[in-house]
Each structure stands twice: as C-alpha cells, then as structure tokens.
Amino acid sequence: MAKILIVDDEDNIRLFYSEELRDEGYEVVTAEDGYELIDKIRSDSPDLIILDIKMTGYNGLDLLQEIRREFYDLPVILCSAYSSYKDEGKSISANAYVVKSSDLTDLKKKVKRSLEENIPAPE
C-alpha cells in the first residue's frame, strides 16, 4: 500500500490524520516540522505528502518550493485551516489543497486520486 508522509506541527492533527488514513489501508509516517521533512522524504520514500501550510517557525508554501527543487514529481497536498491559501498553493505547484476539517472525506478523495493518477505537479 502507498506510504503517506504527514507534516504538521500539531500532534493531534498528525494523530487524527494518521489514524484515519491507516484505516483506509495506507502506511503513514509523520514529521512535526520542516527540519524533519527532507530527512523523512529521503529515509522513508513516501508516495505522497500532506503538508500543513502554517507551522510554528515554518511556512508550508516555502517548504513546498524546497520539495519541488529536489523531488519534483512527488505529489503534495497542502492543507490549512484557511481557504485563502488555495490559489497560492496552486501557483507554486501543489497537487491539491484541502481545508482542515474533522471530516476528512475531501482529503481522502484527493489522496486516492493523487496516488491513482500520480498527478504530476502543475508547470
């Protein structure tokens, strides 16, 4: 099954997303900040990343640009509590964007679609 890397500075979000995605049959690894992110990509070889935009000390949009420099084809889904980042995420090559919610239906659909189609990053 596909491996998903969840990057979020909130423990409860990482735990909630991890449990829900494991229930869907995915293998899940987590990172709590940008320091861990690139190391986790190299060590765990995820098939997809779910990346929080607003983390303490980090901007997920900047991290996405860093990911794209080295791992251009790795699907990345941005997530935020704010819908205002959607257009900005698309403009810097996110594969999808979701607003954080206790209902993960949208996230699960976008994870499945991104993995099945291996959607390349927009140019």
How should these model regions be labeled?
Residues 33, 59-62:
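Acidic catalytic/metal-coordinating carboxylates
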Residues 52:
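Active-site residues of response regulator receiver
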Residues 62, 83-109:
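Alpha4 helix (beta4-alpha4-beta5 surface) of REC/receiver domains from two-component response regulators
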Residues 15-23:
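Charged docking surfaces used in two-component/phosphorelay signaling
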Residues 39, 61-71:
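Short amphipathic alpha-helix used as the core "switch/output" element in two-component signaling
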Residues 30-48:
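Acidic, metal-coordinating helix/loop segments flanking the phosphotransfer/catalytic sites
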Residues 14, 56:
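The feature encodes the CheY-like receiver
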